[in-house]
Amino acid sequence: MPFDVLISNQKDNTNHQNITPISKSVLLAPHSNHPVIEIATYSETDVYECYIRGFETKIVMRRTKDDWINITQVFKIAQFSKTKRTKILEKESNDMQHEKVQGGYGRFQGTWIPLDSAKFLVNKYEIIDPVVNSILTFQFDPNNPPPKRSKNSILRKTSPGTKITSPSSYNKTPRKKNSSSSTSATTTAANKKGKKNASINQPNPSPLQNLVFQTPQQFQVNSSMNIMNNNDNHTTMNFNNDTRHNLINNISNNSNQSTIIQQQKSIHENSFNNNYSATQKPLQFFPIPTNLQNKNVALNNPNNNDSNSYSHNIDNVINSSNNNNNGNNNNLIIVPDGPMQSQQQQQHHHEYLTNNFNHSMMDSITNGNSKKRRKKLNQSNEQQFYNQQEKIQRHFKLMKQPLLWQSFQNPNDHHNEYCDSNGSNNNNNTVASNGSSIEVFSSNENDNSMNMSSRSMTPFSAGNTSSQNKLENKMTDQEYKQTILTILSSERSSDVDQALLATLYPAPKNFNINFEIDDQGHTPLHWATAMANIPLIKMLITLNANALQCNKLGFNCITKSIFYNNCYKENAFDEIISILKICLITPDVNGRLPFHYLIELSVNKSKNPMIIKSYMDSIILSLGQQDYNLLKICLNYQDNIGNTPLHLSALNLNFEVYNRLVYLGASTDILNLDNESPASIMNKFNTPAGGSNSRNNNTKADRKLARNLPQKNYYQQQQQQQQPQNNVKIPKIIKTQHPDKEDSTADVNIAKTDSEVNESQYLHSNQPNSTNMNTIMEDLSNINSFVTSSVIKDIKSTPSKILENSPILYRRRSQSISDEKEKAKDNENQVEKKKDPLNSVKTAMPSLESPSSLLPIQMSPLGKYSKPLSQQINKLNTKVSSLQRIMGEEIKNLDNEVVETESSISNNKKRLITIAHQIEDAFDSVSNKTPINSISDLQSRIKETSSKLNSEKQNFIQSLEKSQALKLATIVQDEESKVDMNTNSSSHPEKQEDEEPIPKSTSETSSPKNTKADAKFSNTVQESYDVNETLRLATELTILQFKRRMTTLKISEAKSKINSSVKLDKYRNLIGITIENIDSKLDDIEKDLRANA
């Protein structure tokens, strides 16, 4: 059926209701069944949107510039499955022009094809829908254009696009009220405007309404918006600069965790008093300069003493940090700012850093109305960034820095580490490269070498720096952006066209490589990392893309990538974090590291736990192999509300991750802004501070990780933690079996008896950042009631073994140990069994062998894993044998059913053959002259015969009526004459009878008037009698004629069936019945025979 016919049929079905663009007045009308066409804008592209009120999810888009149709939306309206849509698009895309759009606004994504191609596909697959037909047949009318959808559009409110697509679309929680209030009208108006902007830019509410998912971004959104509206950027920079350096100084001076928390609280309180919420960033690592964007700035440095003094300062900082690592694990290794001797230079550098940070934070909260102001801010900050980067590069002394474009050309080359195996910087003056003499940074202190090393080396120069200035990209900014989007649209990084990728270098002049692709603030580097496109990542880094720029939710590139599975599928996450390692250790706008988000994703049921575990292992190995202290700093780093990764795992009751982080060195004593430590959170849920879960922390993966970490730092910490007097015995625990994990087996030992468990098993080693089990349990042993929280909603649903490890039972255990010293072991065991029947269950816990000096106390809360393995195996064998028996019986039953089905199929085939022969015989018996080959021919023959029979009936009836017409007329005439004669004879005697009594009445004769009246009355009676008699006779005649006609019909019907009767029909049916069906008809035959008899 052609497309035009489909459209015309659809119009006929709708009573010729033409679809026209609605006017703005119709936008406020209630729901209707007519399609609506509006103009909307997605990613700076105008489209026609067609939908029906109340069914906004069924929408089809058509681009205004070229009339291309989103065919994916058409197939969705036709209710094609995803598999069917994919097959159709793969089949049809080979012969037609198409364009795939990925990323950006969700509703805009899909496959776009020209209008004619869309009509062809709709015609081919017979898709009939008013929305599809309306958008395909729509013609633009300049006099009545479609309205442009406003912000308060119905579609905007009810569209599914407003739903969150990520578990980290966090809800903004309430903040403290400002103590100081202003009474001026301008301040009030500014506050109202700030609240309005804050409501516009407020993140979508999270579906995981848990305490864990309330991110630190809540403390700075409102305050930052007020800063932008009041144009108070100078005060913001100074305040943020002071707070950051105060925190850095506290940590670098070996201050303990309590001092950091007090400093953090004071910052938090001062931030609200000053209408600004400062962000704690003690782990701020400044970007190391790579290539330079501005090549026209003079690079000569007349003062060579600056670089010498700066080199001396670097050595001092590195030596002091290495010496302090043995004493305190919370020190930070901070890259110095450069040899800025004067106070003015330092102040200028601090302002640059503060501006860069504030710029990233403002980009995350500004709306679409402030794009012009943001562009100006971008240009000024970028210019200042490049100038400052040149200053840093003239003085910075980097020993081993890999050349990014070399790894781009040869992906097999590995990146050189910044540090040697001992964790200190190497003081070589040259950069080692694989067969290349190009230097990224040079430490030679003459002017010529500095000029040579400061040039930006490109993949095209390859040592020929003289031709670098001649390279120029002739593409426009829009074409350059489109090229990047084309490369991003490739589903796999291996499909990237290398020639197309090479056209990106160099970027057009004054082009902002950090431009935002979508309305969520993502840069090309964000999507390149999320799509695991390593060649594009390397090219963007070569073009000076800012790896630390955050989107509007505050995520950097690595954080964006962990929400997708592409890096895992492409096996590219290790290489990506080696390129963007700065993102692993630099906090984002939320004050968080990527590791914080991984902890949250580990409890998200929509994420594959194997992928999240793989990401987590890669980050731990990457940080731990370079510097174990750096790994511990990241594990203990607090976000804006003071939560470490260990806090998040404790709040989610994620025992597996909790045990693992404690094993790797995470501290359980750090307090967040709610004055809660991970240990207190675990105790709040009646769980020991060391953590307890179905999987303990001394797994094979963690032991393997410990072997892969730098041996010097690892064994130094092990020797420091081991002391002769603390030979702690670790209770052995059975490890759970996870089918999706790497560890599928565990070394299970025989459970210890009660006599083997002594007091030393409940002690904790004196390692740093560890929790003493005796101290915690003694402090909590006075609690007589269990504590619940929003995480464990119902105490009845809590596993019983978790409650067995409560402080109350610990108090009983300590009392039993003291009684054990006074009484004999046999008597004491009998008494303890009466007092506490669960004691034997708690103390007899099997375990695994593990390093005794590195692990905290572990106690499994799940009693089902404490049973001996032999019992579990016996039960499993019993279940397997029962299942085998049941399956055998089912298989036998199925075999019998198969045999029966095959026999019935063969019988049906025989019956079909018999019926076919009977039909042929019936055709042969009926057909005399012309053969009958099918049922349709037989039906046509029957129709012809019946029509012929009807015509013969009519002819017979007419002949009967003609033969009886004369006789009928004669009979009627005779009857009429008889009636007339009877009337005359009867009228004369009546007159005589009336006239005879007249003379006898003397009174009547004397009155002539009475005589006339009687005569008149008699005449009237006679006339009425005649009329009634005539009507009676006419009615009788009519009835007789009707009976005659019915008799004629009966005669004709009998004549037509003279050769057939009911009995003959029954006999014919009996002859045609097969032997199988004759039994069912015997009863009817017997009834008919008895009735006739």
Curated annotation (Swiss-Prot):
The HTH APSES-type domain, residue ranges: 37-147
Bias kind Low complexity: ranges: 179-201, 448-457, 846-855
Disordered: region residues: 138-210, 448-468, 813-855, 973-1017
Pfam families associated with the record: Ank, KilA-N
Residues that bear Phosphoserine: 255, 806
Biased composition (Polar residues): 152-172, 458-468, 1000-1010
Domain of life: Eukaryota
Keyword flag Transferase: no
InterPro entries found in the cross-reference section: Ankyrin_rpt, Ankyrin_rpt-contain_sf, HTH_APSES_sf, KilA/APSES_HTH, SWI6-like, Tscrpt_reg_HTH_APSES-type
Ranges of Basic and acidic residues composition bias in the record: 818-837
Protein purpose: Part of a complex involved in cell-cycle-dependent transcription. SWI4 and SWI6 are required for formation of the cell-cycle box factor-DNA complex. The repeated element in the upstream region of HO (5'-CACGAAAA-3') is called the cell cycle box (CCB).
Subunit structure: Component of the transcription complex SCB-binding factor (SBF) composed of SWI6 and SWI4. Interacts with MSA2.
Protein name: Regulatory protein SWI4
Gene: SWI4
